[in-house]
Amino acid sequence: MDFETFPCPLPRFKGEFPYIQSPFEFSLHIESNPGSCDLEKDNIVFLAKTTKDEREDLVKELLKYINPNKGTLFAQNVSFEKGRIKELASIFPEYKEDLLKIYNRGFDLLWLLNNNKELYEELGFTGKDLETFNFYDERLSGSFSIKKTLPVFSDLSYDNLDVHNGTEAIVVYANYDNYSKEEREKQQEALKIYCRQDTWAMVEILNALRKLVK
């Protein structure tokens, strides 16, 4: 899962505070069986069509496709996604129960690469094994961000996209009202492709890790 958010200096909508990471888009790649996920068929993207408040529509769409009672919510740096889910649960109490169930099912892809002592203690590891990386490559240069991690495991690239990173996504969303109808539609499609790329990148990394441990 991946959110794209807009950190506005001034609160725009109900329940917000300055610089809150207000979600306007998400992408999901749904893996029903291990290793079985298609770039397009198993992808869900929600994107706000305007700069008006579409957060409740986003929540409804999220709950339409994520079963709060089973499965695992994967993200890279899952604390960010969990933070947005928790904020939405506070803003929309009518969806709080299901949103918090999803919140509690969050699992960080980084835990498989970097480390998570609590997780590995539960799995029976002790001592020095809890202090070491599970995986490292010099190309990471000390960073486990998705942009650094992806090239280690896949030739998937952001270079050919019209939107290349989260900052550019914010700029496109913030300029909705400055575009012509045709340009807005073009830019919105670019946002969808970019957000989809983020979650597909996680699928690629996860599948590569599966191959490593076989």
Could you tell me what each predicted segment is?
Residues 30-32, 89-92, 153, 209-213:
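A generic secondary-structure signal for well-formed alpha-helical elements
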Residues 2-4, 108, 198:
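Acidic active-site catalytic centers that drive phospho-/nucleotidyl reactions
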Residues 42-166:
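Conserved DEDDh/DEDDy metal-dependent 3′-5′ exonuclease domain
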Residues 3-5, 9, 30-32, 76-78, ...:
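Active-site proximal loops enriched in glycine and acidic residues that flank catalytic Cys/His/Asp
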Residues 133-214:
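Acidic, Mg2+-coordinating catalytic module of metal-dependent nucleases/exonucleases
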Residues 11-13, 117, 207:
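Hydrophobic alpha-helical membrane-insertion segments
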Residues 1-66:
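Conserved RNase H-like, two-metal-ion catalytic cores of nucleic-acid enzymes
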Residues 23-25, 104, 188:
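Active-site lining segments that contact anionic ligands and/or coordinate catalytic metals
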